[in-house]
Amino acid sequence: INVTAGGDGIKSTNDTDTTKGYTTITGGEITVKAGDDGIKAETALTIDGGTITVSESSEAFEGTNITINGGTLDVYGSDDAINAASTTSSDIFIKVTGGDLKVAVGSGDTDAFDANGDIYISGGTIDVTAQSAFDFDGTAELTGGTVTVNGEQITQITATGPGAGGHGGW
């Protein structure tokens, strides 16, 4: 699937029905160039496999809950690459259990991983290129996987950048 969009590339939203707004990707090849969000799910975005490239976007992945269990992902966001936020839920998180992720963002007040809640990384290989790698309002746990930020492997997640701990938005 190749998507070029002036707004969101792939979008699953429904503000009024909590049983909707889910996107699950289990395989295939997806390429997105978007003027706004690359792939957005109002409630939950789950990636279990596939090859996903988001070469242009404001935010490559956006949702209330973002879970990455596998796949080969190469994503770029001019604002935040992976953004978990919500105006209606307090259960907000980014969870990475597997996969091969290459995550990059533009310069300025931008974040590779931005959660208005929690960040959990327990597996996978993550290569981040960013001025600010992690921004979160809740807790952050790194219990497995390999995470490299600007060429340096890290063993714990700390909030970084000018908006650390209180950033992100819907």
Predicted regions and their residues:
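A composition-driven surface/loop motif
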Residues: 1-170
